[in-house]
């Protein structure tokens, strides 16, 4: 018994093997949809990775700046000759000036023993000035808030009464900003 061959209505023998144009177009549409959804997922993944990377970078920068500020601030008032060096000269919400006698000669050298940390209005750069000009410490600073405490722990604005400084830094771009805080107690005060 011979296999039956299919014929179209005009009597022409129809092909039974291969793909038609419709099959090819359907496969192309399905493949394109899969590619588009894959591209969308890759794009979302890239955005999430960039956001996380920016946040980690902001956190590392903020920690570095905070550690540097607090470490230097703890040295404020260092006066081995007991010459009466005032530890804090300026105590403002976004500017702090302090000094220490690192070489022990009884005189504060303004080019290396007097330090200013500041965030200028309208800028997003935390700067440190130790006599050589205000050099950038970190960028993308959204906020620097300095608050000062006296011996009893009460807030003060008098530089002569400062015994501790609370430092709050907000660093990073909108949506990935990081806030770090610490309190540095001045170790070299005469009670």
What do these predicted ranges mean?
Residues 64-86, 135-152:
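Generic detector of solvent-exposed, compositionally biased contiguous segments
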Residues 2-4, 17-78:
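Aliphatic-rich helix starts adjacent to a transmembrane/signal segment
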Residues 89-154:
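Type IV pilin-like appendage domain
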Residues 2-8, 47, 57, 102, ...:
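Short linear sequence signals and composition-biased patches located at protein termini or domain-edge surfaces
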Residues 50, 57, 73-100:
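Short, glycine/small-hydrophobic-rich surface segments
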Residues 82, 109-113, 178:
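Residues that act as N-cap/strand-start positions at coil-to-secondary-structure junctions
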């Amino acid at each position: 018994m011979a296999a039956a061959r299919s014929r179209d209505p005009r009597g022409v023998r129809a092909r039974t093997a291969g793909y038609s144009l419709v099959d090819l177009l359907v496969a192309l549409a399905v493949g394109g949809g899969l590619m588009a959804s894959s591209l969308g997922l890759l794009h979302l993944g890239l955005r999430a990775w960039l956001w996380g990377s920016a946040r980690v970078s902001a956190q590392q920068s903020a920690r570095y700046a905070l550690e540097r500020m607090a470490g230097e601030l703890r040295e404020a008032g260092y006066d081995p000759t007991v010459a009466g060096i005032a530890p804090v000269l300026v105590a403002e919400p976004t500017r702090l000036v302090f000094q220490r006698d690192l070489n022990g000669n009884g005189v504060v050298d303004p080019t290396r023993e007097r330090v200013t940390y500041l965030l200028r209005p309208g800028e997003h750069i935390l700067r440190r000035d130790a006599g050589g000009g205000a050099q950038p410490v970190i960028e993308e600073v959204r906020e620097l808030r300095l608050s000062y405490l006296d011996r009893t722990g009460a807030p003060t604005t008098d530089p002569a009464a400062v015994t501790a400084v609370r430092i709050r830094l907000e660093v990073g771009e909108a949506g990935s900003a990081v806030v770090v805080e610490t309190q540095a107690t001045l170790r070299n005060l005469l009670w």
